[in-house]
């Protein structure tokens, strides 16, 4: 039982770690694909942003020959109308027409060459197709966002879970997304595929020059450095949350959980070894009899490993069943999307390595120690000497020390989580409900507010550009102060 529990923890944490470490490693030009990152320093505040102004990408593509491809993305939840019903907070992308060829995403339905070529074409994922069009073909269906009509021209395969890009609906550049220039719209994630001999430092300096030219005197009171980060490094990169829509990971948290899982696995293996030792008298007599019949030590060691392998295999099956029950809770806690995908060959490679490591840890001491004694010692029981007892005591001490250490760590983690959950947010969040998708209300907001206020269960209604104040925006505006135009960064 203890071995199954420790293996369950190792499986859950191991699959999650594999998912974290393989983020964005599947793009066709992943070794040459970069995203623009910028460092702004304004009024003593430093900000690292993964967003850019819309013109930066197109100018850079035109002027820098080492940039082979360029693609821009605005990622945000949007209000989208399906079948005359508005759905708020739909994960959406507004992007350039080369999005699919750039990232290598393919379509399940529709022609990849033409499906995203029009100005009013939209692509949805297969999960979105099942969600919004469960009993009909979504191709050709009309959807609406921000007052613009679109027609679904393709269904793409779901974006892999270990991608920093998340979306259900893909839109082309439209409306104000098209018109944004240097004076607004600091929302674009800009990606480049570079030539193999590209100089990253030189490109960063050239991008900063393009920024300074485009922003002219808006950057006179600010410093701006532009760099490039490999797309495969995005998941663990450090950027301001309001200026990066990518799903982020934490290497320190990853290392802590992996170390904890390994400690738990070792504890389970030690407990298993102690159980082997507790039946040592019976096993020793059996070893002595086999040796008297001509069995060699190597043969006996292999038998121990075979017996251990049977127990470990049963424990792995039990651990898998427990992992299936535990993963939803773990995902809710970590915010991950880890799944037990039995069609993924990585799962079987991981399980094979886990089984081998567990067999070696759990079975090595009984196999080598108990087969060391001679025929007379084992049959006569002389093997139960001081060395065996000392080693067993050491295992028990290690087991209890590790267990107590884990309990202390869990206690302090629990206290930290309780502290975070009990922090004063500056407002009362009880009985407060919000809808993410403010832009979809448009001019109808006042009418909607008046209708909602008629409901006796609703005390009041208000609108805010971003989520209830737990998330800030990412934008740049221009304001005229005392006759001077200055840049304001919405942090």
Short names for language-model regions:
Residues 11-15, 227, 308-375, 415:
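Small-residue-rich transmembrane alpha-helices
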Residues 26-27, 208-263, 281-282, 296, ...:
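Membrane-helix entry/capping segments
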Residues 95-109, 121-252, 447-491:
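Mid-to-C-terminal secondary-structure elements
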Residues 55, 64, 73-74, 81-111, ...:
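The feature marks short, hydrophobic/small-residue-biased sequence motifs that occur predominantly
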Residues 1-21, 31, 389-416, 427:
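Short, strongly hydrophobic transmembrane alpha-helices
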Residues 21-30, 39-41, 166-177, 237-245, ...:
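Short juxtamembrane loops and helix-capping segments at transmembrane helix boundaries
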Residues 13-79, 178-179, 183-191, 204-206, ...:
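Membrane-proximal extracellular/periplasmic loop immediately following the first transmembrane helix
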Residues 1-2, 268-311, 372-383:
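Intracellular coupling helices
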